[in-house]
Amino acid sequence: MLNRRQVLLATAAVTVGVLVGLMSNPASAQSGAPIKIGLTGPFTGGSSSMGVSMRDGVKLAIADINKAGGVLGRPLVAVERDDEARNEVGVQIAQELINKERVVATLGFINTGVALASQRFYQEAEIPVFNNVATGTVITQQFTAPKEKTNYIFRNAASDNIQAPMIVEEAITRRGFKKPAILADSTNYGQLGREDLEKALAAKGVKAVATEKFNIKDTDMTAQLLRAKEAGADVILTYGIGPELAQIANGQAKLGWKVPLVGSWTLSMSSFIDTAAANGDGAVMPQTFIQMPNTAKRKAFIEAYQAAYKTERMPSPVSAAQGYDSVLLLTAAIKQAGSTDGRKIREALENLQEKVEGVVTTYDRPFTASDHEAISANIPVFGVVKDGKVVPAHEDDVAGDKALRIKPRA
């Protein structure tokens, strides 16, 4: 039988062994209840290439963080919900994630309309929201001063008031077109984007020769294209979702009328590239991320995505990269706050002390109390569709990516 001294020594040895094991394996050191994070987007339907890519990027980041020990010693768990790109579904999901699932924050929102309809519930509950794909200019301005004392809506995507001037600068100034036509879908995203395009054109002293609207699931753009052609348009500026944008390119081919397409970032989606096929070649759009391994972080991210999801080409590289980065930003704030309390997370986001090395960029105090946009105008570059994939449109953009474009510190 062991005496008291032998028992104490054995117990101490076991304790040391456990501690060493925990130190050598951070994942096993996690304790306490999981930290629930809402994850919402369209995982089915016409916007799903964006939603699924965003979701996959988020899940990759969560896996990386949990492997390294989690946050505050607790694992992260994503509570996924498919909003189907429908405003009313997004509203229901917001209330469920807040009241039933008790999430500490929510990541996602692909569609501007869904974001605008849903995020007021998070604002009222004082739960931070990260719009990691939706780009409508008004999204982060919905609850600003003096109407609201605090704002719980953040974004790490290039807003439309960044993209629209870029599109106009590319088409009018850099390429020298003089008679633009605007084709925008009928959603909040398309119509708010159209307004931003019109403002950017007006700043150049230019007015669209034709402004046309189309609906989600439209498959024939002949009428809109004929009116643009008859008006003498020499370039088409687009704001819409991928499947319908492909019908613009296909309609041009049917009419034998090939003028360039310059539009918002959604021209990079697989639903545009695959549906338009060769007709989509040459389409140009702003991008925060192009699937190129030109930094160590991007190389690791691309390889991890390809291995995890068994695909060579991401359906929406921008969505995947921004989804990944949104998790890194949120967890940096939780770590700094030392808490999962919504107010403390918001305060930490507005004054992040730690640089966050993301896939899109390195974030160095990206937010303040009055600026909830992580992406500044110097970060996006232009991509162009070439042989079924997006590549940099300009050589200087390739160089810019290698240098990594960073938002000036607030």
Report each predicted region and the residues it spans.
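Extracytosolic ligand-binding ectodomains
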Residues: 2-10, 19-410
